[in-house]
């Protein structure tokens, strides 16, 4: 039996504007060096940028749909079997799906060419909403990798 203490998930406080846990997690994921106020300002600025862009859709709905489009359903894990390392496709658990989607959205919005971060975020949200952009490309790469290694799926235990 393990002697290690059981780990508990931290309770995340919902964001002050929308009272939403997913938004709070995204803001925390964006945060650099503990500057939460800056991160919040950028996120809400990005939502403000989205306001006129999509007809008949609220900015929050665009964000949620973009996040849903980026979530991977399957990924590969390295598994060592008899001296050889195989890339074994496994299902992604829901909490990791969300974390990966957020990480990719933040990462690829930072690489964009727009002037300020709010515009970059808004652009990446729009691209993900329309199923294009770098975050979607990353998800497709992960799915393609899992598809090409489907032969090793029996090593999944």
From Swiss-Prot:
Keywords (alphabetical) are: Ribonucleoprotein, Ribosomal protein, RNA-binding, rRNA-binding, tRNA-binding
The biological process GO terms on file are: translation
Gene Ontology molecular function, alphabetical: rRNA binding; structural constituent of ribosome; tRNA binding
Annotated Gene3D superfamilies: Ribosomal protein S7 domain
In the UniProt record, which is one GO cellular component term? small ribosomal subunit
- Which SUPFAM superfamilies has this protein been placed in? Ribosomal protein S7
Detail the disulphide connectivity of this chain as listed in its UniProt entry: none
Outline the subunit composition.
Answer: Part of the 30S ribosomal subunit. Contacts proteins S9 and S11.
What family does this chain come from, according to its entry?
Belongs to the universal ribosomal protein uS7 family.
HAMAP family attached here? Ribosomal_uS7_B
Could you tell me what this protein does? One of the primary rRNA binding proteins, it binds directly to 16S rRNA where it nucleates assembly of the head domain of the 30S subunit. Is located at the subunit interface close to the decoding center, probably blocks exit of the E-site tRNA.
* Protein's UniProt name: Small ribosomal subunit protein uS7
Species the sequence originates in = Bdellovibrio bacteriovorus (strain ATCC 15356 / DSM 50701 / NCIMB 9529 / HD100)
State the organism's lineage. Bacteria, Pseudomonadati, Bdellovibrionota, Bdellovibrionia, Bdellovibrionales
